[in-house]
């Protein structure tokens, strides 16, 4: 136990000795770096390294050094400069600066700068000194001077110390402007003095330039000053008008109007008034004005002088010189405008007056003045008829009006006609042979005196086609115009009225007055000439009426006789012959009546051989009394013969023509005459095809006692019909002749076959002619 106690004492002595003993151990730089690195890795130590990495410092110490830099720089330190001075990375400086600004309300971080309250107080004192010196200052100027944000300066500096350090007040209209009361008083004094010295309208910009006051302060203080005048607006071109000048203007305008009863806009504008009409309305609110382009007339002047004088002029049937009752300052344009305005207001009837060069004529006065021109119009109309001028004008006018709209159509239709005729020519040249339906090309028979329409459909005269095309072609697309016919000219009227006007001193208006009535009297003369023109040809028209009536009746008798003959043939052939009959003789009847109606309606038609389309167009241009009847007649050409005759009767009735009663006693004479003419043509014929055609028609008439209107393509049908009435040698002769004609037409003209066939036809020609001329049967008398 004792030994243990001794051991304890010994150890205590050693410990005390160790405590009392001081030992110094120096670490190397490498050891220090390793120790610090180890502490950093174990997050037992937080340090900030310098930029070169050779030194480090704790964040707390760095924060104290940043605050020291802020103090050293007078309360405003740029963090970039602080970073360079402390040799520390800028990001660590910015981070600590943000913490400093957040923890300390008296320190602010703005645009990378630390600013404390001492610096803010300092710049507030500078702002106060500047404001006291200038009297007015703006935040934008301070921001430029101190290189600080305008919001920071306004809220954290100026407004915070306004009324304390900064002695001034804030502009209510512009919170970014501050000024002193003394400055406001000085501006008021300048404005008041300048406005008091002005005696005429002056531009506000000129006033501000002279007194050195800003425009915004001028307008804000103007109401407080209450000057003896007014500013026209707050725009850049505003003017200040003193009351003394406005009163002078008002007095001058009132005096001028009282003396003259009108106001000139130019005179008012010379007073400095930009809108004369508005000023006049304000100046005379109870007065009524007639506002013209150049002047404003008082309503009393217009009512008491002009309107009264016009009514008197109308009542006395005279004329009025407006320039004598209106102010002499008014020009002729002003006077004309006054007259037009009065007429527009319907204070007088406009139709009662005519205005010419400030002179107003009543209509009765002018009617009396030009009364002698009625006789002139009558004389000129008669002279135009006697000389033929009017007739020539009618022809030219009709050609222009109708030609422009239909000449091209008629030309095109003429071309269609030519193609139709060529097709018919080709069709008419074929004739059937026996039961095999062989056809022979023949020419159409010549038209006899009564059946003048028979050749219309068979016409193959190429020269006539060329002639028609020549007349219709060329220039069809060029629009023609006819100069209006002037029977009464302005110069003629001037000669008649000049003497009367000279007595009144108005001869200078003679031409103007004459031009007003030239058209009227020219129309009167033209109407009278038309009456004379219509009365002149009545005798000729009656003769034409009778001649056409006879021709139509003759054609209707022919159609009746031809219809009787075609009914002897088979039904299918009858239908074709009816169609052919209407397209030939029926077409002629339609043409005759259409041309007659066109003449009655004063329409000019160049081509007398019209087709259906041309007649329809012509009917549309005719008077209403003819139109429907002509259109129905054209439609009936494609129907039966009975329907066509009914339609023709309607047209004849519209034309005041009559249809002669049927006299069957004359039918035998007409048939004999027709046969005789066919025989005459047969004797003169040398063409084999035409000779066969004529022979067939003559034999048909001899055998049946009826006449037939048929083209060459019906020859085979006719031969088939008369076959039973002929002997076998006669049938063989006609059939052989028909076959040879067909052979000639089908072979080449210079071939040997054609020559042989032609020689055989020449040899047989006499026999065929003799058969047609001398054939007779027991039931047919020699007279037939």
Curated annotation (Swiss-Prot):
GO biological process, one term: protein K69-linked ufmylation
Principal EC category: transferase
Any one GO MF annotation of this record: UFM1 ligase activity
Matches recorded under Pfam families: E3_UFM1_ligase, UFL1, UFL1_C
Region (Disordered): 401-481
GO cellular component term, pick one: endoplasmic reticulum membrane
Keywords recorded for this protein, A-Z: Transferase, Ubl conjugation pathway
Enzyme Commission number(s): 2.3.2.-
Function description: E3 UFM1-protein ligase that mediates ufmylation of target proteins.
Family, as annotated: Belongs to the UFL1 family.
Protein's UniProt name: E3 UFM1-protein ligase 1 homolog
């Amino acid at each position: 136990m004792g030994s243990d106690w001794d051991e304890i004492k010994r150890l205590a002595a050693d410990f005390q000795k160790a405590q009392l003993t001081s030992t110094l151990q120096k670490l190397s730089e490498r050891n220090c770096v390793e120790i610090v690195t180890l502490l950093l890795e174990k997050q037992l130590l937080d340090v900030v390294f310098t930029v070169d990495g050779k030194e480090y410092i704790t964040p707390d110490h760095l924060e104290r050094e940043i605050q020291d830099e802020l103090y050293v720089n007078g309360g405003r330190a740029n963090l970039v400069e602080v970073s360079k001075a402390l040799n520390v990375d800028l990001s660590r400086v910015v981070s600590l600066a943000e913490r400093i600004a957040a923890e300390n309300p008296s320190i602010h971080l703005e645009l990378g700068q630390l600013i404390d309250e001492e610096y803010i107080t300092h710049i507030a004192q500078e702002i106060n000194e500047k404001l006291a010196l200038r009297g007015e200052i703006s935040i934008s100027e301070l921001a430029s001077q101190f290189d600080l944000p305008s919001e920071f300066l306004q809220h954290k500096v100026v407004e915070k110390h306004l009324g304390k350090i900064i002695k001034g007040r804030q502009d209510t209209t512009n919170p970014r402007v501050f000024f002193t009361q003394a400055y406001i008083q000085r501006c008021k004094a300048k404005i008041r003095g300048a406005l008091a010295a002005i005696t005429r309208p002056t531009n506000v910009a000129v006033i501000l330039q002279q007194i050195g006051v800003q425009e915004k302060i001028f307008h804000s203080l103007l109401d407080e000053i209450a000057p003896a005048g007014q500013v026209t607006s707050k725009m850049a071109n505003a003017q200040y008008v003193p009351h003394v000048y406005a009163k002078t203007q008002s007095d001058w305008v009132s005096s001028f109007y009282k003396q003259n009863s009108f106001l000139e806009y130019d005179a008012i504008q010379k007073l400095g008034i930009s809108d004369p009409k508005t000023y006049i309305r304000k100046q005379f609110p109870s007065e009524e004005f007639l506002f013209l382009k150049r002047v404003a007339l008082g309503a009393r002047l217009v009512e008491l002088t002009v309107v009264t004088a016009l009514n008197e002029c109308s009542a006395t049937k005279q004329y009025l010189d407006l320039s004598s009752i209106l102010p002499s300052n008014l020009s002729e344009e002003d006077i004309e405008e006054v007259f037009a305005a009065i007429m527009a207001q319907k204070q007088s009837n406009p139709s009662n007056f005519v205005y010419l060069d400030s002179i107003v004529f009543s209509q009765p006065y002018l009617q009396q003045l030009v009364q002698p021109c009625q006789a002139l119009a009558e004389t000129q109309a008669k002279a135009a008829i006697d000389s033929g001028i009017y007739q020539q004008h009618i022809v030219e006018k009709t050609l222009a009006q109708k030609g422009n709209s239909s000449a091209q159509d008629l030309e095109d239709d003429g071309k269609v006609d030519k193609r139709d005729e060529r097709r018919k020519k080709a069709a008419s040249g074929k004739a059937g042979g026996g039961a095999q339906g062989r056809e022979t090309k023949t020419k159409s028979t010549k038209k006899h005196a009564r059946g003048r329409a028979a050749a219309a459909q068979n016409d193959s005269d190429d020269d006539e086609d060329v002639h028609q095309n020549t007349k219709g072609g060329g220039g069809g697309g060029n629009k023609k115009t006819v100069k209006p016919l002037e029977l009464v000219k302005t110069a003629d009227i001037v000669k008649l009225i000049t003497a009367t006007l000279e007595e009144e001193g108005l001869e200078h208006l003679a031409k103007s007055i004459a031009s007003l009535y030239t058209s009227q009297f020219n129309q009167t003369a033209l109407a009278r000439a038309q009456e004379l023109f219509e009365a002149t040809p009545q005798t000729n028209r009656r003769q034409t009426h009778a001649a056409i009536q006879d021709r139509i009746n003759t054609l209707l008798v022919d159609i009746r006789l031809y219809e009787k003959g075609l009914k002897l043939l088979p039904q299918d052939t009858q239908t074709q012959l009816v169609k052919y009959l209407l397209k030939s003789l029926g077409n002629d009847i339609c043409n005759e009546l259409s041309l007659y109606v066109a003449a009655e309606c004063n329409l000019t038609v160049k081509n007398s051989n019209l087709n259906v389309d041309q007649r329809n167009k012509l009917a549309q241009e005719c008077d209403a009394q003819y139109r429907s009847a002509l259109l129905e007649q054209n439609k009936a050409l494609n129907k039966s013969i009975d329907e066509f005759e009914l339609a023709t009767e309607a047209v004849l009735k519209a034309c005041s023509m009559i249809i002669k009663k049927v006299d069957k006693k004359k039918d035998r004479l007409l048939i004999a005459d027709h046969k005789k003419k066919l025989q005459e043509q047969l004797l003169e014929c040398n063409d084999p095809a035409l000779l066969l055609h004529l022979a067939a028609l003559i034999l048909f008439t001899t055998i049946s006692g009826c006449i037939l209107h048929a083209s060459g393509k019906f020859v085979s049908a006719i031969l088939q019909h008369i076959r039973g009435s002929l002997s076998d040698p006669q049938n063989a002769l006609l059939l052989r002749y028909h076959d040879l004609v067909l052979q000639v037409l089908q072979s080449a003209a210079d071939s040997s076959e054609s020559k042989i066939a032609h020689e055989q036809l020449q040899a047989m020609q006499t026999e065929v002619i003799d058969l047609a001329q001398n054939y007779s049967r027991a039931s047919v008398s020699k007279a037939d």
